Design a protein with these regions (language model features):
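Short polar catalytic/cofactor-binding loops
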Residues: 5-11
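Ferredoxin-type iron-sulfur electron-transfer modules in oxidoreductases and energy-metabolism complexes
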Residues: 30-46, 87-217
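Short, structured protein-protein interaction patches enriched in aromatics and acidic/basic residues
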Residues: 53-62
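Glycine-rich phosphate/adenylate-binding loop and adjacent beta-alpha elements
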Residues: 68-83, 87-89
Length: 217
C-alpha cells in the first residue's frame, strides 16, 4: 500500500511536502491506520506523530485521514481507503503544525477552557457525594464522553476562520454538559458567558463535527 504522509518541520523546512512510502500489508489483514503509520515509521524513523492508548480512549492520535478527521487507532484501512487507493495522512487542519502530524493544541484547549468545563456548586459541601436520580444522570449521556481529540473543532469552518475566538464544538458540548447537570449551580453564569458572538451564535449548523466525532457525540 502506498502511504502519503505530510512532512513539515517549521524550524528547518521552507514549506510542507507529502512523502510517499510503500508499506507491505499482511495478506487478509485489515489493519488500523495507526498500524500502517507504524509500518511507515519503520522505513523512516523521522516521521513524527502522537499516539498512546490504541483504543480510541486518549484521543492523542487525531489526524486527517484521506480528507476526513479521525483517530488513527480505530480507523481501519478498509474504511479509509478505496480498493487500490492511497492512504493520505495529514495533521488536523486549522491548528499550527509542530512537526509532521503533530499539531499545537494550545488554541483548542484555550477555547475549551473558556466554558469552565468543571462542576461549580456553591452550596455547602455535603457529607457524602452530591446525589442524582437515575433520570438526572441519564441526561448527561452523550455529553460527558468527549476525549478532547479535537477532530470536531478542526473540522469546523467557523473554528478555521476564528480559532482564537470561537469556542468550537468541543467547548459548546461541554458547556451544555454542565448546564444539564443537576448538581451544577452556575447556570446563569454559564449562559451569560455564551452570549457573545463567538460562542453559540458562531455555530452555523454545518455538522462536520458530528460526522467525524469518534464517540458519536
Amino acid at each position: 500500500m502506498l502511504v502519503s504522509i505530510y512532512r513539515y518541520n517549521p524550524e528547518t523546512d521552507a514549506k510542507p511536502a507529502m512523502q510517499d512510502i510503500e508499506v507491505d500489508i499482511p495478506a487478509g489483514k485489515d489493519l488500523m491506520v495507526l498500524d500502517v503509520l507504524a509500518l511507515a515509521k519503520e522505513k523512516d524513523s523521522s516521521i513524527a506523530y502522537r499516539r498512546s492508548c490504541r483504543e480510541g480512549v486518549c484521543g492523542s492520535d487525531g489526524m486527517n485521514i484521506n480528507g476526513r478527521n479521525g483517530l488513527a487507532c480505530i480507523t481501519p484501512i478498509s474504511e479509509a481507503v478505496k480498493p487500490g487507493g492511497k492512504l493520505a495522512l495529514r495533521p488536523l487542519p486549522g491548528l499550527p503544525v509542530v512537526r509532521d502530524l503533530v499539531v499545537d493544541m494550545e488554541i483548542f484547549y484555550k477555547q475549551f477552557e473558556k466554558v469552565k468545563p468543571y462542576l461549580i456548586n456553591d452550596d455547602p459541601t455535603p457529607a457524602t457525594e452530591r446525589l442524582q436520580s437515575p433520570q438526572q444522570r441519564e441526561k448527561l449521556d452523550g455529553l460527558y464522553e468527549c476525549i478532547l481529540c479535537a477532530c470536531c473543532s478542526t473540522s469546523c469552518p467557523s473554528f478555521w476562520w476564528n480559532p482564537d475566538k470561537f469556542i468550537g464544538p468541543a467547548g459548546l458540548l461541554q458547556a451544555y454538559r454542565f448546564l444539564a447537570d443537576s448538581r451544577d449551580t452556575a447556570a446563569s453564569e454559564r449562559l451569560a458567558g455564551l452570549k457573545d458572538p463567538f460562542s453559540v451564535f458562531r455555530c452555523r449548523g454545518i455538522m462536520n463535527c458530528v460526522a467525524v466525532c469518534p464517540k458519536g457525540l
